[in-house]
Amino acid sequence: MLHVSTIEGQLDAKGLKFALVAGRFNDFITERLVGGAVDYLVRHGGDRADLTIVRVPGAFEIPLAAKKLAASGKYHGIICLGAVIRGSTPHFDFVASECAKGLAHVMLDANVPVGFGVLTVDNLEQAIERAGSKAGNKGVEAASAVLEMVRVLEQI
């Protein structure tokens, strides 16, 4: 049998600092995502004093705040949360796409894990389902992914 070295991240937030960037647009959804992410990090050993929440107008502004936070060197990971709900115009497509691309650039340019917890949904029902209802809480999932990546990168 061939032995292969495996690197995996442990889900332990103790001693780590995280920034959460939350869009205020659709805040009745976003606040559920923030609550889920904060609860997850605390349950996994994080300290509320090591969490910073930055509020921005909406999803389009999230990448700029994330970029500034990543460049500060103060945070081990950044968790980005928001909700873009499709309307009757193409605006949804532009905002969702540019937010995702912007966050990918931040992560790759800064070498800091960035979680994409920005919901891109067709309607309010889907948003509610993904903010702590039937489909779980995507804020929790984004926090988990960032935590795991922080711990993976420590080993590479």
UniProtKB/Swiss-Prot annotation:
Give me the residues that bind 5-amino-6-(D-ribitylamino)uracil, please.
25, 59-61, 83-85, 116
Q: Which Pfam families match?
A: DMRL_synthase (PF00885)
The record's top EC class is transferase
Q: Which UniProt keywords apply?
A: Riboflavin biosynthesis, Transferase
Q: Record keywords: Transferase included?
A: yes
- The positions making up the signal sequence are none
Gene of this entry: ribH
Please state what the protein is called: 6,7-dimethyl-8-ribityllumazine synthase
Question: Where along this sequence does the record place binding of (2S)-2-hydroxy-3-oxobutyl phosphate?
Answer: 88-89, 130
**Pathway(s) where this gene product acts:** Cofactor biosynthesis; riboflavin biosynthesis; riboflavin from 2-hydroxy-3-oxobutyl phosphate and 5-amino-6-(D-ribitylamino)uracil: step 1/2
Q: Which molecular-function annotations from GO does this UniProt entry contain? A: 6,7-dimethyl-8-ribityllumazine synthase activity
Task: Enumerate the HAMAP family for this protein.
Answer: Lumazine_synth
Tell me the function of this protein: Catalyzes the formation of 6,7-dimethyl-8-ribityllumazine by condensation of 5-amino-6-(D-ribitylamino)uracil with 3,4-dihydroxy-2-butanone 4-phosphate. This is the penultimate step in the biosynthesis of riboflavin.
Q: Which domain of life is it from?
A: Bacteria
Catalytic residues identified in the record: 91
UniProt-listed GO biological process terms:
riboflavin biosynthetic process
Q: Which pairs of positions does the record mark as disulfide bonds? A: none
Q: Which family does it belong to?
A: Belongs to the DMRL synthase family.
| GO CC terms of this entry | cytosol; riboflavin synthase complex
According to the UniProt entry, what is the EC number of this protein?
Answer: 2.5.1.78
Keyword Secreted (UniProt):
no
Q: Which reaction does it catalyse?
A: (2S)-2-hydroxy-3-oxobutyl phosphate + 5-amino-6-(D-ribitylamino)uracil = 6,7-dimethyl-8-(1-D-ribityl)lumazine + phosphate + 2 H2O + H(+)
Organism encoding this protein: Solidesulfovibrio magneticus (strain ATCC 700980 / DSM 13731 / RS-1) (Desulfovibrio magneticus)
SUPFAM superfamilies under this entry? Lumazine synthase
